[in-house]
Amino acid sequence: MSNSTPMSSQGATTRTVTPTSQGGSRTMEVRPQPVLRLSAPSGVLRLRAEPTERRRIQWAEDVVDNEGMGKKSSKVCCIYHKPRAADESSDDESSGSSSDSDSDSEVDNSTARPSSGAGGHRGRAHKHDHGDCEHGHNHGEGSGKPQKRRQRRKPSPNAYEKMPKVKK
């Protein structure tokens, strides 16, 4: 038989009396560890963010939201060409560069050009009616001196291959 009786007025001390096989009894006393309680008020923890002086992206005034979603992006996913006035030049820089230049630094003004296969017959013989002009030369019908061919220039990179200009 087991008998449990609280014995102390101070807490939950428990005494257990257990009969043994020899006719006696065993008494076991269990005392819980005291809990230390502070009566001081608990502190307040205040979390503060880091100063906002870190580097952050600031878009220039002329950056365009080219996807129409209210976001500005540095990724080239849509090619946007800023509208220009009719009398404004289509070159980004001054007209100092020649279109015949073989230079890699040529300004790509992103205008459509005919490919060399279809319609790119610049400098070749042409046929149309000049009437009887009677001025002693042919109009490119193929007879006479062969015309001097221009040397092909390197193709300029497209908008996806070209690095954006950095304004200082």
Swiss-Prot record:
Keyword Nucleus: yes
GO cellular component, one term: nucleus
Keyword Nucleus part of the UniProt annotation: yes
Organism whose genome encodes this protein: Phaeosphaeria nodorum (strain SN15 / ATCC MYA-4574 / FGSC 10173)
Protein name as it appears in the record: Type 1 phosphatases regulator YPI1
Pfam families, A to Z: PPI_Ypi1
Basic and acidic residues bias locations: 47-59, 129-142
Signal peptide positions on this chain: none
Region (Disordered): 1-168
Polar residues composition bias: residue spans: 1-25
Family recorded in the similarity comment: Belongs to the YPI1 family.
